[in-house]
Regions:
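Conserved ABC ATPase "signature" region
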Residues: 37, 52-70
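Conserved ABC ATPase signature
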Residues: 74-78, 82
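Catalytic Walker B motif of ABC-type/P-loop ATPase nucleotide-binding domains
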Residues: 99-102
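Short loop immediately C-terminal to the Walker-B catalytic DE motif
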Residues: 105-106
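Helix N-cap at the start of a conserved alpha-helix in ABC-type nucleotide-binding domains
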Residues: 110-112
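H-loop/switch region of ABC-family ATPase nucleotide-binding domains
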Residues: 135-136
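H-loop (His-switch) and adjacent beta-strand-loop-beta switch element
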Residues: 147-160
Length: 181
């Protein structure tokens, strides 16, 4: 347990979460629009319906994730990459401050993986959303992250440049594709 030393921290409704996909999630029988809108539930309080602002937020999130054309489709009929975009759009409805992503590209093919990383990078650089990502993809972490927390036999936290000079980072050769411990 720690203490917040500066500022007031973030409230739970200021953090969007993208969980690692499970078999149960992949077969969820709801329309894309409904799933994206569900990211607004924290804003509704005791109100049973979404308001215009929340509906617009969902439309905007679907546009950012380039899934507007899928709004009426059933989630379980989508490809893995499309499903991840839907879940990321849902997380965007929850917050514009911080996203916590748990293995966001797990199980995706290389082309879709690259597209997802590009979308995530754009959210960070253009929209100013802080992204904390859990990943076993060390190459992507080195390529996209400003800071890296490496937890293995030893722990490292610091900038990308410092990581590459650290004992943990030197075990991973980015130019060769590498392999992390």
């Amino acid at each position: 347990s720690g203490r917040i030393l500066t500022g007031d921290g973030l409230r739970k409704n200021e953090i969007g979460y993208l969980p690692q996909q499970t078999v149960v999630q992949k077969d969820f029988p709801a329309a894309v629009r409904e799933i994206v809108l569900s990211g607004c539930l924290g804003r509704c309080g005791s109100r049973p319906f979404y308001n215009k602002e929340e509906k617009k937020l969902a439309v905007d999130a679907m546009e950012k994730m380039q899934i507007t054309q899928l709004a009426r489709r059933c989630y379980r009929e989508l490809s893995g990459g499309q499903q991840q975009r839907v879940l990321l759009a849902r997380a965007l409805c929850a917050t514009q401050k911080m996203l916590l992503l748990d293995e966001p590209v797990s199980g995706l093919d290389p082309k879709v993986t690259a597209e997802m990383y590009t979308l995530i990078e754009k959210l960070n650089r253009e929209d100013g959303i802080t992204v904390i990502m859990i990943s076993h993809d060390v190459a992507a972490a080195v390529r996209y992250a400003s800071h890296i927390l490496h937890i293995g036999d030893t722990v490292f936290f610091g900038t990308r440049a410092d990581y590459l000079q650290s004992p943990q980072g030197r075990l991973f050769d980015v130019k060769k594709g590498g392999d992390s411990q």
